[in-house]
């Protein structure tokens, strides 16, 4: 992975407003995660190659970004739970096909409502390596000073290879201002940043999945990572989980 670097990362939880160009997101810098540290983390793959991440929120559902499947056929994708070393066929792994996808008005032109639920072909077996992540209540906010984490197997920036092990970035919510009409929170990290490779991975604050990695924006030599604000979609998520597609 690239050397650790100092830089401010403005990670925004979006609900409305038009924002900049969308790209993938991955963890650059940070540290290597420990085994079973993020048992809810899902690797979304096509032909064995990761292209997005997500979080297990129900034994049959993974929460990720709708932009992950823009122009992609979900029938050719798979979801891997319980993975740690992507180069090994670990006994902890559980691999699923996707039975259905549920969106909530995703608008790719304006990057709105970039959230998606993947229904797995069967229930995941919960183990120390496969667990559910709790979600925040509807309309909940994250206060400045809150410590959060982002984890994933994002690409190594120089060689464009996916990380063998998940990387984790510790961030702290700040009171940095956002652009007009943006609904966001800022986070600051001295150990890395989000760049390309892990769209859909969760932003976890106090044990709750508060955000879903959506896209990046570069402005004034700074990279701002934007996360869909999960709390704005909690009621919709519950409606899908309680009434799954047939």
From Swiss-Prot:
One of its GO terms (molecular function) is heparan sulfate proteoglycan binding. Glycans are attached at residues 139, 170. GO terms for biological process: antimicrobial humoral response; cell chemotaxis; defense response to virus; glial cell migration; intracellular signal transduction; microglial cell activation; monocyte extravasation; neutrophil-mediated killing of bacterium. Pfam families: Trypsin. InterPro entries: Peptidase_S1_PA, Peptidase_S1_PA_chymotrypsin, Peptidase_S1A, Trypsin_dom. Its main location: membrane. Keywords: Antibiotic, Antimicrobial, Chemotaxis, Disulfide bond, Glycoprotein, Heparin-binding, Membrane, Serine protease homolog, Signal, Zymogen. It comes from the Eukaryota. Disulfide bonds join 52-68, 148-205, 178-184. It is found in: Cytoplasmic granule membrane. GO terms for cellular component: azurophil granule; azurophil granule membrane; extracellular space. Residues 27-242 form the Peptidase S1 domain. This is Azurocidin. It comes from Sus scrofa. The gene is AZU1.
């Amino acid at each position: 992975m690239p050397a650790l670097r100092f830089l401010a990362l403005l990670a925004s939880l979006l609900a409305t407003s038009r924002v900049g160009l969308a790209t993938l997101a991955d963890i650059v810098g940070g540290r290597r995660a420990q085994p079973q540290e993020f048992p809810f983390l899902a690797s979304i793959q096509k032909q064995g190659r990761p292209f997005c991440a997500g979080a297990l929120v129900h034994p049959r559902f993974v929460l990720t970004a709708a932009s992950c499947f823009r122009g992609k056929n979900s029938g050719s994708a798979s979801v891997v739970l319980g993975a740690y070393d992507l180069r090994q066929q670990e006994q902890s792994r559980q691999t699923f096909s996707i039975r259905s996808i549920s969106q909530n008005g995703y608008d790719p032109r304006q990057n709105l409502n970039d959230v998606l639920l993947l229904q797995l072909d069967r229930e995941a077996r919960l183990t120390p390596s496969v667990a559910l992540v709790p979600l925040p209540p509807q309309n909940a906010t994250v206060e400045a000073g809150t410590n959060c984490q982002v984890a994933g197997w994002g690409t190594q920036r120089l060689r464009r290879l996916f990380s063998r092990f998940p990387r984790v970035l510790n961030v702290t919510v700040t009171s940095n201002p956002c652009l007009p009409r943006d609904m966001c929170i800022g986070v600051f990290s001295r150990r890395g940043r989000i760049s390309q490779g892990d769209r859909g991975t969760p932003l976890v604050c106090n044990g709750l999945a508060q955000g879903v990695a959506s896209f990046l924006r570069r402005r004034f030599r700074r990279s701002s990572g934007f996360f869909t604000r999960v709390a704005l979609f909690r009621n919709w998520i519950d409606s899908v989980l309680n009434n799954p597609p047939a």
